[in-house]
Structures are given as C-alpha cells and as structure tokens.
Amino acid sequence: MPRIMIKGGVWRNTEDEILKAAVMKYGKNQWSRIASLLHRKSAKQCKARWYEWLDPSIKKTEWSREEEEKLLHLAKLMPTQWRTIAPIIGRTAAQCLEHYEFLLDKTAQRDNEEETTDDPRKLKPGEIDPNPETKPARPDPIDMDEDELEMLSEARARLANTQGKKAKRKAREKQLEEARRLAALQKRRELRAAGIEIQKKRKKKRGVDYNAEIPFEKKPALGFYDTSEENYQALDADFRKLRQQDLDGELRSEKEGRDRKKDKQHLKRKKESDLPSAILQTSGVSEFTKKRSKLVLPAPQISDAELQEVVKVGQASEVARQTAEESGITNSASSTLLSEYNVTNNSIALRTPRTPASQDRILQEAQNLMALTNVDTPLKGGLNTPLHESDFSGVTPQRQVVQTPNTVLSTPFRTPSNGAEGLTPRSGTTPKPVTNATPGRTPLRDKLNINPEDGMADYSDPSYVKQMERESREHLRLGLLGLPAPKNDFEIVLPENAEKELEEREMDDTYIEDAADVDARKQAIRDAERVKEMKRMHKAVQKDLPRPSEVNETILRPLNVEPPLTDLQKSEELIKKEMITMLHYDLLHHPYEPSGNKKGKNVGFATNNSEHITYLEHSPYEKFSKEDLKKAQDVLVQEMEVVKQGMSHGELSSEAYNQVWEECYSQVLYLPAQSRYTRANLASKKDRIESLEKRLEINRGHMTTEAKRAAKMEKKMKILLGGYQSRAMGLLKQLNDLWDQIEQAHLELRTFEELKKHEDSAIPRRLECLKEDVQRQQEREKELQQRYADLLMEKETLQAKF
C-alpha cells in the first residue's frame, strides 16, 4: 500500500520562518500556494497558524484581572461566541477559549480541594495537542532530516525567485498597455494638429472624480486677514532625539521582553503577598480566621469630679470672655487670659482609612458559570441553581470617583472628611504629622501655651493669624533691643588681587566648567606656547624645510694657519661655527622627517644623538629672546640697504630670480645610493642615471597622489553637482526640443504665408473663371428653355391638327 501522509503536528521554528517569509511575498489570501512550501502542513493549518500565533498584532502577555473579569461576563452574555468576544477583549478566539477553560478547571480543582500549583490544561505524557497552532514553535534540531533540508532549500529558492512567469507576463502586459496609451496619445495629437478635435470619452464614475474635482474643498471667505502668524519660525533641532534608536522606535521584541519581565515580577509579588490564600490551600480551612486578643485600656488619668471642675472653670471663663467682649475690652492682656478653648479645631489629624471589603469576582463568576453548566434539566422542577450575586461592573475597569466634600456636614463629631478615601481635602485642614499622638480633638487657640503648637494652628482664622504676626514682630523687636553695643571698630583691607580671586571663586562656586572645556583651554594654552616657542626657531624649522641628516664639520678653517685669518674671515668662521651648533641642536631636538615616509622608516635621515649631545656640551646652544632676534633682524636689514646702495643693486624681478634659481638647482644632483647631494659636474654617468630614475619615481608618486586626490575630488563634486548636471542636461534637452519646435513652426509659418500669397493672386482668376462658367451655363440654360418652349408649342400644334 502507498504511504499515506497526514499533515499536521507540532510546528517547528523552520516552518514558522518559511510561513512568515511566504506571507510577506504572497500575502494573506493565497494559503494554498503558501502551504505548497510546507510539506507537512495544509493551507487551513497555515492560515490558522498565522492568525492564531504569528500575526504581530496578537497579544501574548499574561492575562490581567480586568481581562479575566471581562471574559467571564462576556462568556455569560454570549456563550460559545468566541469570535465575537475575542476583538472586545483584544485576544484571539483560541486564547479566550483556552483561558476560559483554564479558569473553569482551576475553580473545579479548588472546589475539589486538589492541588492547584500545576496548570490543569497541561498535557500529560502521551497526549496529542489538539491545537498545535496556538503553541510556541519547537526549536530546530542540530541534525535535520533530509526531508526538512530539502523543504528548506526549495522554499528558499522559490521565495528568492521574484521574476517568475506571472511577473514577466504582468510586466509585458504593462508595457503593451503603455504602448497603446502612447499610440492613442500620438493619434490625438496628430488629429488636433490637423484641425480635428476628438473629445475623449471618459467613463462616468459612480463616486467623486478625484481628477476633476477637489474632494472636501472649502474655499476661503472673501476679505483680508492677518497672516503674521503663518510665518514659519525655525525651531532649534534637538539632535539628541535624532539618534537611530529614537527614529526607529521601540522594537516589538524589546516590548514583549519588558512585558514578560513585568509578568514575572507580578507573579513573584502575588506569591509573596497572597499569604492567606496559601495558608487556606495547605490547611483546607474554608475561611481564614484569627483569634482576637483581649482589649486592654490604660487607667483613666482624670476622675469625674475633676472633670466637673474643669467644666465649671470653662463656663466661668466663657462668661468672663463674653462680658469683656460686650464691654469693648480688646487689649492684649484680656485677649490672652480670656481665650476660647471650647471650640474644636477643624484640623483633625489624618486617620488611617479602613481597607474596603472586597470579594474575588473572578472566583465568583467562574463558580456561577460552572453551576450553570452542570445544572439539570428544568423538567425535574425544584429550586433554581443558587448563584452568587453579581453585576456587570467587571466588564469595564473600576475606578474611584473623586468628590468634593460637603463643608456643611463636616462637624467635629462626624467622621473626618479629610481622611475619607478619594475626597478632596479642604484648605487649612491638611493634617501635620504628629508622632506618638492619638488623633483627636485639639483646642483652637492656646494663648497660655498649655498645649504644643503642632496641633493648635488654625490658619483659617484671620484673628489668629494677626495675633501670631503681632507676637512675632514684638519678639523680633525685643530681640534687636537686647543686642549689646559694639566694643571695637574693625577696618578690613583687601589685597590687590582680592576682587579677581573673589570673581574666580564666585565663578567656581556658581558654575562648574565642563571637562571638555577645561581640556580645550589647556590644549589652546599648549598650542600658544608651542607657537611661541616655534617663533624662536630659525626659518628652516618653522617652515619644515629639508635639512641635512649629517653635519659636515670640515668646513671650518684651522685658526693657527699662516698667514693668519683676517677679521672678515674670522667673522665668517664664527658664523659657520654657530651654524654647525644650530644644525646639531636641530638634529637632536627637531629631526627632519620627510612627509612621504613613516616614522622609524627613514634610514637615510637617522642621526646619532650621542654625537650631537657631545658636541653641544663643548659648544652649547644659546637661546635668544624675541627682542634680541628682532634687533639682529633690524641690523641685517640696515646692512642689506647699505650694501644695496653701495653696490647700486636694484630690485630683482621674479623672472631673473627664477632663472638664477634654475641655474643653481641644475648644478646640484641628488645621489639616492648615498642619500646626499653633490655637484652635477662631479657625478658619474651611473650616478646621473640613478638620480634621474629617482626623480622619475618621485614624479610618478606625485602624479599618482594627485590623480587619487583628483579622483576623490571628482567623486565628491559628482555627488554634490550630479543632480545639477542631470537637471542641466534635462533642461538643455528641453531647450533643444523647444528650439526645434520653434524652427519647425517658423518653417510652417513661412510656408503658409507663401501659400497665402499664391492663393491671394489665384483667387481673382478663379472667380473670373467661375463667373464665366456661370454665365455660359445661364446662356445655355436660357437656350435650352427656349428650345423646350418651341418644342412644346410644336407639340401642341401637332396635337391640335390630329
């Protein structure tokens, strides 16, 4: 018998990826074509997998309490209508059905007093999942079967093929349609040029023609309006919000990971905080009870007789206060002694609100649904199934309504309104934190300081506020009067740089400079010092000109020669000696490195530092100040002017200077083998050839460098000016086309003008010819009419005879 392949089973990660790629290519309507890529799945299973698991809009986070309440209420209202319930909750129908059954099974386990730690919907070993499309994919094995590898390669090849037969046919049809449109357009143009107008028949659209009309157009009213607010004001761009992660937005994987982390923390807190339910599950007691301890109160600190005495004293003080008010006595002494103590302050300390009694609505609804599911037939009669009282408040999330308190009903002997949950507190009644104090009644005024000040302040009473201001003012005045007189006079003398130091200290106190600004300022100081130091060097170091790698000390003449040296020769020897010292110093501190070579690769310019150090120890290098160098420069300039006037030298032109430079430069030849320069007339033919080869190589290197630089600049200019060039080419082409049209129109105009001239000259002749033809025709008609009349008379005559 042939092998029968039954499609279905657990979904693998490879199949999920193929399904997602196929949906991206073929869409969500060609499930048969998508299923042809998956050998073990049918089209119906692929569609169910997409709409039940792979769709990005599916919510896979943990169920919240509001969603569970809404699910149970909607299941009661619309039983078995999961496709209708799913979009209301925001889940899929399979998720709603699965969680509904999970809640019912969990309730049944709790009623049967079974263990509820495990998931009741979890599959047992050997069972087959009836809905594998709603479960996570199984990871791919390391060693895949040949069938799976073949399926994967086939799917990869088919999905990568974007130019199939249908795509080519569509492209061909599109080209034919474009050709037909262009042909019809050309035909209409030719007919219009010939003077034949053809109205294009347009199909009447049923709705709005968006090519002819402007939908929802609202024309502006007539009149002048102020348009100053329409000016665009450029905002400062916040480049911190233009990063790539801000532009891309939050990824779906990051959002789901954050939701999963929240779910884990929620479960952990639920296990830690729901201790009574855990005790109930382990002990089996249906109701959590706790034995209350005996109430122990402290002994009374005042007897009834003492309380009566306090009441009598209060009544007496009240009578005295009223008498003083009626008599008009309002001085500070009487107001202090006769203060009011029988009115309770409105600022009552905040009492801890009682936790409102609540019930587990999810458990009640699940029990009601189970009771309705297991009810017997109503034909037996009897009482109805007992159910818990419930309403439809669980369909929407519950929220507490904020109410404004009623100030009329807030009396001292009622429940404090500022402690009620969800009510707006009144001004002046915000309680102050009082440690180790029982909230209760507090006197409104306490002029004799009997009670602490924390619980007696009532800022809503204007008289109390004024009294406090007067007392504070009086206390401040007495304190200032009690200050001792000054004993000594002091005079403070600030140093010279005190203001600058104070300004720097204030700047340091008020403003903390950024580390980058500090580094930039230090770098600027170092650069300035480097530039200042560089100005003290000679021109060869400042301009980074080539310098000799070795110092030739043989140019010095011996001092003890016969005949002895003249003063001019001695001066020249001093200049040579100073030049040699400067060369040793520069080779030690500022060695020359050609720009074409890297550090450490200059073999020809390597120097012996010990030799330079030894020479500088015998002949130290002396550094001069800027003023000394300026004086020496001025002396040289003066001497040059004297020599120029004495020798009658004029200004040297650039052509003469270049000629002398070329002649001098042609006499010097560089020997690459010896890494030195020599005179050209002293070099051999081989040395000249090597020198020319070296110069050719250097020139080729320069040419290559310049070519690369030119190519880079050309590429940059092409990027910058490519759009302008293409635009210029397009405009030039349009200009040429317009010029051709102008020439063609001018030619046609001249042709029609010549034709008009010929027609104007030929029209009179044609008119004469036509007139002659008409005249001849009239004469012939006249002759024929006359002949007809004669023949008619002859006929009548003959008839009369016979």
Curated annotation (Swiss-Prot):
Start-end of Basic and acidic residues biased regions? 118-127, 246-262
Q: What is its main location?
A: nucleus
> In which compartments does the protein localize?
Nucleus; Nucleus speckle; Cytoplasm
User: Residues in domain HTH myb-type?
Assistant: 1-56, 57-108
| Protein keywords | Activator, Cell cycle, Coiled coil, Cytoplasm, DNA damage, DNA repair, DNA-binding, Isopeptide bond, mRNA processing, mRNA splicing, Nucleus, Phosphoprotein, Repeat, RNA-binding, Spliceosome, Transcription, Transcription regulation, Ubl conjugation
Which residues get modified to Phosphoserine?
S303, S358, S417
Q: Where is this region: Interaction with PPP1R8?
A: 260-606
- The ranges of region (Required for interaction with CTNNBL1) come to 200-206
- Could you describe the post-translational modifications of this protein? Phosphorylated on serine and threonine residues. Phosphorylation on Thr-411 and Thr-438 is required for CDC5L-mediated mRNA splicing. Has no effect on subcellular location nor on homodimerization. Phosphorylated in vitro by CDK2. Phosphorylation enhances interaction with PPP1R8.
User: Which segment of this protein is annotated as the motif Nuclear localization signal?
Assistant: 165-271
**Record region (Interaction with PLRG1):** 706-800
Which Gene Ontology cellular component annotation is one that this UniProt entry carries? nuclear speck
DNA-binding region per UniProt: 31-54, 82-104
Compositional bias segments (type: Polar residues): 408-418, 426-439
Q: Which residues form a coiled coil?
A: 146-192, 676-701, 761-801
Q: Which PANTHER family match?
A: CELL DIVISION CYCLE 5-LIKE PROTEIN
Q: Which family does it belong to?
A: Belongs to the CEF1 family.
- Identify this protein by name: Cell division cycle 5-like protein
Please tell me the species this chain comes from.
Answer: Rattus norvegicus (Rat)
